[in-house]
Structures are given as C-alpha cells and as structure tokens.
Amino acid sequence: MYYNRLVEKQIELKLKTSGAVVVAGPKFCGKTTTCMLYQKSFVKLNTKQAITMARMNPKGVLQGENPRLIDEWQKAPDVWNQVKDDLDFNYEFGKYILTGSSTPADKTEVHHSGAGRIAPVRMRPMSLWESKDSKGTVSLKSLFDEVEDFPWDMNEKFDLENVAHLICRGGWPVSVVAPKEIALEITKNYWNGLFVFEDCENERFRNKKPEVLKMIVRSFARHISTEAAISTIIADVRQSNERTMDPKTFDDYMEALKDLYIIEDMEAWNPNIRSKTPIRSTPTRHFVDTSIACRSLGISPDDLMQDLESFGLFFEDMAVRDLRIYADTLGGEVRHYRDNAGLECDAVVHLEDGRWGAVEIKIGGDKLIEDGATSLKTLRNKIVEKSEEKAPAFMMVLTAVGGTYRRDDGVYVVPINLLKP
C-alpha cells in the first residue's frame, strides 16, 4: 500500500526545472518507492556486483530511458560527476533522479557541487498528515494567509496514549501501514539494523563501532529538544558508559550520524534585533524521527505516559519533524529562538517571502497553553519594537491533545493531529 508523500510536489517541480534531482534522507523513509513513480528506467546499487560494475563504468549507469533513476548513487560516487558532465553536454530537464541514504564514503570523489544542474530535495519519514493520523482540519498555509473563518474542532477521540504510540512508532512507511499491534516491533527492527555495517562498501561507516554510535545517539536522546552543548553530550557519553571519548573521536562519529541523516539539529533564528540582549546561537538537538531516540533508550509508550516531562520533550521533537515537512512544501524552513533574557520560541516557520509564524509546542492543558501564548505575544512585541522584521503572520500553540480554536488574543491553539501543510 502506497501513501502519497508531500515531497512528491517538490520532486515534480525540480524535474521540470533541473536536469537532475537528488533525493536524500535516512534509510527506509520511502525514497526509492516514491522516486519509482517518476522513472522510465532505473538501476539499484544495492548489491556488490551492481556497485562494482558502477564503479568500473559509472558512465554506463546513465544508459537508459529518461528519467533515469539511480538508487543509492553514493555507493559509486563518480556517478555524480558523470551526471553533471552529461548535463553539461546534453542538458535536458528531468533527465536523472538520484537517491541517497548517506553521503559518499569519500566526498573528494565528488568533483562538482552540481549547482544549476542537480537540484537537492530532502525527504524525511512521514508526517502525521501523510500517515493519515491527522485529520488536517487546520492548514499551515491558511495560517500564513490569515484565514478568517478558523475551524473549530473538539478533537475528542484523540488522547495522550495515541500520541505516545505515534512518537514511538515513528513515520517509517512500513511501520505506518502495519497493524498497530506490530508497528512498534517493526520500528524496533529498524533500530536494530541501523548500524549494521559489516558488508557495507562505505569504509567510513564500516570502520565505526556500532556500540559507540548507539552510545552517542542515546546521549543525544537524553538531551532531545534542548540546547545541550556538545561538551555536555560528550560528558554524558563518558559518564553513562564509563569510557573515554575525546572531542575528535566524537566529531568523527557525529559526522557519520549526520551523514546518515539521523541527527537533524535545529539552527537558531536571528531576526537582527536592536538590543543589548544577545540572541543565542546554540542549535536545538533533534532527530529526523523521534522513534530513533525512543528505541535508543528503550522507551515505550507506557514509559512516556509515566513521565510527562520527558513526554513533552519527545513530543516537541515529533512536532518539529512535522513542521519541517510542512514548511518544506511552502518553501520555508523551521528554526528556534532564544535570547539571554530567557525569551524563547520552540519553532519559527520562516518563508522565502519574509513572512514568519511563531510556534510554541506544548502537551496541552490550560496552564501550558496560557504560558505558550504569553511567550508568543512577548516575542511578537519584542520583534516588532526592536527589529526590522514584520509582525508574525500567526502565533500558534501546537498541542498534543485537545481541541482547536482561536483565542481572543489572536493566538491559535492547534493539536498536532489536526494540522496539515
């Protein structure tokens, strides 16, 4: 069963406006299945024989009807150079589709950036809208367009137990379509195989110790949705595992995790405020999918229900995943704001045309919603008074549960299972 993906529109647009498209994202997020919709011929570099042949004759990999899909191109990095050279001599729109679940083993083998010829598209696991776990009552686009008739929905049949399951299940397509009683086991299998590199042709990953990668992931998971410094995470690795970890080794392993598209930190938003209070630039620690963090710590839905403080941090991570996917469809990006005066905003959705929306992420409940709304209004006032930015197009408290409505002060309250792009 195939569920349509929001990234499809981006792929279609890039194929109409670029010679090639490269779709990058973590393993098992659905890249190949989605890209197969657009190919007229394909080659999969998923066997030793195919990889060896592609490395010996990378130009031959390009032979076939266009659009030509080259799956896991990074296993034969010179394919990239051949695609770029072919487009230099015989440019056509939508000629090639490349997919990759990691960066190349040796980045020096890629001699050109591909700018102007190869358009990048980022693909993540499924959002709740894509997995059909969101009714889509509220559109992010409509909030930017300042909708007049805001929908009202009590959302009565959705509770924290539902949210806990979605956090632990993740947005992996195979888990999404599976019956609820086995979905978590499928996600567990994904985690168990994530760092199995014995037969990996990529020496940079094969030389990494899986147990060390898992230790670092666990430390990141313990600091999920926080601005923990790298030094703090290194100290956590040392203390939790009673082993040494020098910064150089940590950086090497961290690069591998980012090259596998597992860690996806959120950068700070800097609106150039005229103030003596500096804006903090430390990124917020996030995962491409929260289920990875859950599995790394052995956290179940029941565990989340027993610790609502941790629940809130893991929920924030899942909410950021969905906001990123939705923002991508609007040509925007998601960042966070925090200054040394303590004012913060969990997510700032910023569009290319300069419009922006401020989002506070809360589990729910009157007090937390009120706290979120107060913080949003304080941020709005500060931005308007002390920067050249316009007022936010919208302010939203994104909740785990509860109904959706617009408050008298203009702040929207929207549960995550009612949001769509």
Language-model features: locations:
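N-terminal pre-Walker A segment at the start of P-loop NTPase domains
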Residues: 1-12
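Conserved lysine of the Walker
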Residues: 31
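Hydrophobic positions on the alpha1 helix immediately C-terminal to the Walker A/P-loop
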Residues: 34
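Conserved catalytic/switch belt of AAA+ P-loop NTPases
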Residues: 81-104, 112
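Interdomain motor-coupling "hinge/lid" segment immediately C-terminal to the ATP-binding subdomain
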Residues: 108-226
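Accessory nucleic acid-recognition modules appended to NTPase machines
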Residues: 176, 180-355
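Conserved catalytic cores of phosphodiester-cleaving nucleases, focusing on short active-site segments
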Residues: 319, 323, 345-349, 355-365, ...
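Domain-level recognition of nuclease-like catalytic cores that cleave nucleotide substrates
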Residues: 398-421
